[in-house]
């Protein structure tokens, strides 16, 4: 989507994009948890979901969380689509958590691709800054801005990259995830060259892997640097693979730390056996480790993006 010179918009100092070139590596989960983490620290936080996938880690759609803005619905990406198509400020759902506002993604975001391509024929490459323009009126209100991006489409990924200051790149250890980073590397270079020279790769990291597989991790780090560059920072924290607590938390629309808080009053396996509770009522003890891993990863991301405490 990039080819010509554009009038630049300086991205907010406090903006971080979570991006990669392949789905299924934890990108949306990481973005939601990073935003929730900074909000829990008392920082006014905005999460912008520039993806057509219906990710709902925060329970916005399923549980109706947050205060909807006046007017038409903004869920399923409808609000983001209208802001871009009407060239108007973003309309987030307020207080999805204390201090956390969210511009949800969803199906309507995918419809932006055709709109952007149509506008590019008459307006040129400047359309890649459409999100940056819609964000600009709101940005001063927030201490932290997090972008979840779309690995399924270059145009959408570039839209988020053009509005962000920092890029962090998650990956799994498999070859397809590593090779998928070539897409984000290509989009990063294009956006930085022609639309957002302030964009920086803050680092990359492994997600949902065995923390004790250190030999394999060393190999993966080399693979990452081959794709993103030898100078790429690789974060030390590896969030372990714990599928059951992660799945349970997401079904309840809870962040890992929130789900972990339910453990002391959780039903136990013997309650299920006695018919006093359902399996879904039992909070797995593994959520403690998962919550701690995610907290440590969030702190490392913020440290390398100049926002650590």
Task: Walk through the language-model features, giving the residues of each.
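P-loop NTP-binding core
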Residues: 1-309
């Amino acid at each position: 989507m990039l080819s010509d010179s554009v009038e630049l918009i300086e991205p907010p100092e406090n903006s971080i994009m979570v991006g990669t070139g392949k789905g299924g590596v934890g990108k949306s989960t990481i973005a939601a948890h990073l935003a929730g983490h900074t909000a829990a620290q008392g920082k006014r936080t905005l999460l912008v979901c520039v993806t057509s996938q219906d990710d709902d880690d925060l329970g916005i759609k399923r549980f109706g969380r947050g205060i909807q803005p006046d007017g038409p619905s903004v869920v399923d990406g409808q609000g983001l689509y209208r802001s871009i198509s009407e060239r108007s400020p973003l309309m987030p759902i307020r207080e999805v958590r204390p201090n956390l506002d969210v511009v949800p993604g969803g199906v309507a975001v995918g419809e932006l691709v055709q709109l952007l391509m149509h506008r590019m024929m008459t307006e040129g490459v400047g359309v890649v800054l459409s999100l940056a323009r819609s964000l600009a009126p709101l940005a001063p209100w927030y201490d932290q801005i997090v972008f979840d991006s779309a690995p399924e489409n270059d145009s959408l990924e570039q839209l988020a990259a053009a509005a962000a200051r920092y890029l962090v790149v998650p990956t799994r250890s498999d070859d397809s995830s590593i090779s998928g980073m070539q897409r984000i590397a290509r989009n990063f270079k294009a956006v930085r060259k022609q639309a957002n020279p302030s964009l920086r790769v803050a680092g990359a990291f492994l997600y949902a892997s065995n923390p004790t597989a250190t030999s394999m991790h060393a190999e993966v780090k080399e693979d990452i640097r081959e794709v993103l560059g030898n100078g790429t920072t690789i974060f030390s924290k590896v969030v372990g693979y714990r599928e059951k607590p992660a799945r349970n938390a997401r079904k309840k629309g809870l962040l890992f730390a929130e789900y972990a808080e339910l453990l002391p009053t959780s039903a136990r396996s013997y309650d299920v056996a006695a018919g006093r509770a359902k399996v879904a009522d039992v909070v797995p003890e593994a959520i403690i480790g998962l919550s701690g891993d995610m907290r440590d990863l969030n702190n490392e991301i913020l440290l390398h993006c100049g926002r650590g405490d």
